[in-house]
């Protein structure tokens, strides 16, 4: 007999889990279909393990770059990479347990299998043993997330992707990270800090090109200072496996790069191609992203989508969580106008040092408001944590303001501790704070964040 639910999520990542937990709190009968591990990309091969690796790299930096000038004579006889991985995976396992406990408490059924639409209200699930079962629901959420992109070039199979990075059991001596986005920059920083000879290959003139120019310029400066070898205007045309097991990355018009490990970090694609969207009549664009309106509705009544798979979305875990919860509020808690405002979403890149940003870059503000209506404030200093050492690191910040009242429409920073500064400022900017509001806030000294309220 086919089991019927009020609400089903295909995909047990952050967005699906958040939406179902909220729906269940209103007494709805829910099920989540997940083919791999609960938590999706974020918990298993994304935010969580990435942040653990960031912290591990941070400790290595403290020992190697800063400890001597703070009076610590530290000698690390051995770095046990396997211990770091063991600790990381144990932490992830505890998160899995927590998810299972919360879902069980909320009486949400967890169906371990691969879900595929049969029609607009029916999903066929292929279980681990190969058997199939069908479930139906009044409301279905597509939350299948994304997967790493690999280019179609000769030898691409010799490289690993970001998922493969988190499957490494030992560190390579030399690595080439291919990509210009935040994933590539973050992985490069981790590898370099842990002692790997690291090459970062980007297609154009710099990584993170969509960031504010001040951030991009400073990032490039720090990459060079820290020893990451940046290869610009480098588009791989072939990966060659050599007799000694090493890999050579060949780029048109550029020098070859020979390493022990190649990591593809050149973007992600939506995991929507095998879930039978055509059977339900759900529309996607030419790249497989699901078309939705501001309420997360697809073109098919009763089918919704959140997270990395939606067209023109923001591929961040908190965005999927927020959209999923608001969707359940609208569907099951009598809030028909509830939706997520996708503007002014704060973001952080866990580079070395980290980047934090919310709102418009200076070029974006000029394009939107006109140069005559934009005023920019900047600050440049050395992070105090590093200022007392020989390994000084820059910290740079910018406020982008518009109009006579100088409304703050953009805030950007790169430097030690910036990742933990941005959240509160995002609240202020979301509320419409002006430069005068920032000026009227007493600074906390000595901190990096005080620069945002003392710029002139």
UniProtKB/Swiss-Prot annotation:
Gene3D superfamilies: 3.30.390.30, FAD/NAD(P)-binding domain (3.50.50.60)
Cofactor(s) required for function per UniProt: FAD
A single BP term in Gene Ontology: glutathione metabolic process
One GO cellular component term noted in the UniProt record for this chain: cytosol
Location of this chain's protein in the cell: Cytoplasm
Pfam families registered for this protein in UniProt: Pyr_redox_2, Pyr_redox_dim
Catalytic activity entry: 2 glutathione + NADP(+) = glutathione disulfide + NADPH + H(+)
One Gene Ontology molecular-function label: flavin adenine dinucleotide binding
Cytoplasm among keywords: yes
Broad EC category: oxidoreductase
Glycoprotein recorded as keyword: no
Residues that coordinate or bind FAD: 14-15, 34, 41-42, 50, 115, 308, 317, 445
Active site: 445
Family named by the database record: Belongs to the class-I pyridine nucleotide-disulfide oxidoreductase family.
Function statement: Catalyzes the reduction of glutathione disulfide (GSSG) to reduced glutathione (GSH). Constitutes the major mechanism to maintain a high GSH:GSSG ratio in the cytosol.
Protein name: Glutathione reductase
Lineage: Bacteria, Pseudomonadati, Pseudomonadota, Gammaproteobacteria, Pasteurellales
């Amino acid at each position: 007999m086919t089991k019927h639910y009020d609400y089903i999520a295909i995909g047990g990542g952050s967005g699906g889990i958040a939406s179902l937990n909220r729906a269940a709190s209103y007494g709805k009968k829910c099920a989540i279909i997940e083919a791999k591990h609960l938590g999706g990309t974020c918990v298993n091969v994304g935010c969580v393990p990435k942040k653990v690796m960031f912290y591990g790299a941070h400790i290595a930096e403290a020992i190697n770059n800063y400890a001597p000038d703070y009076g610590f004579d530290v000698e690390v006889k051995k770095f046990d990479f396997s211990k770091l991985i063991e600790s990381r995976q144990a932490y992830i396992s505890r998160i899995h347990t927590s998810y299972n406990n919360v879902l069980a408490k909320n009486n949400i059924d967890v169906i371990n299998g691969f879900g595929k639409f049969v029609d607009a209200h029916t999903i066929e699930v292929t279980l681990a043993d190969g058997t199939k079962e069908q479930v139906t629901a009044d409301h279905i959420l597509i939350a299948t997330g994304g997967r790493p992109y690999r280019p179609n070039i000769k030898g691409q199979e010799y490289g690993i992707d970001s998922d493969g990075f988190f499957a490494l059991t030992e560190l390579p001596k030399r690595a080439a990270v291919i990509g210009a986005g935040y994933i590539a920059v973050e992985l490069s920083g981790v590898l370099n800090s842990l002692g790997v000879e690291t090459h970062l290959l980007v297609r154009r003139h710099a990584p993170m090109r969509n960031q504010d120019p001040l951030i991009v310029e400073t990032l490039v400066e720090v990459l060079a200072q820290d020893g990451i070898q940046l290869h610009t205007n480098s588009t791989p045309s072939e990966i060659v496996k050599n007799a000694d097991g090493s890999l050579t990355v060949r780029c048109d018009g550029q020098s070859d790069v020979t390493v022990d490990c190649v990591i593809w970090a050149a973007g992600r694609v939506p995991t929507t191609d095998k879930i039978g969207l055509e059977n339900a009549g759900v529309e996607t664009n030419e790249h497989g992203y699901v078309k939705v309106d501001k309420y997360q509705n697809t073109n098919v009544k009763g089918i919704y989508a959140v997270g990395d798979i939606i067209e023109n979305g923001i591929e961040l875990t908190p965005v999927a969580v927020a959209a999923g919860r608001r969707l359940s509020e609208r569907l099951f808690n009598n809030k028909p106008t509830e939706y997520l405002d996708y503007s002014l979403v704060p973001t952080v890149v866990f580079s070395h040092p980290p980047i934090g940003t919310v709102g418009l870059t200076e070029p974006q503000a000029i394009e939107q408001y006109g140069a005559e209506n934009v005023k920019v404030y900047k600050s440049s200093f050395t992070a105090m944590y590093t200022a007392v050492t020989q390994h000084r690191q820059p910290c740079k910040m910018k406020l982008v303001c518009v109009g006579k009242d100088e409304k703050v429409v953009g805030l950007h920073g790169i430097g030690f501790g910036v990742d933990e500064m941005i959240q509160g400022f995002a609240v202020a900017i979301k509320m419409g704070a002006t430069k005068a509001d920032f000026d009227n806030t007493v600074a906390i000294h000595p901190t990096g964040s005080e620069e945002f309220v003392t710029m002139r």
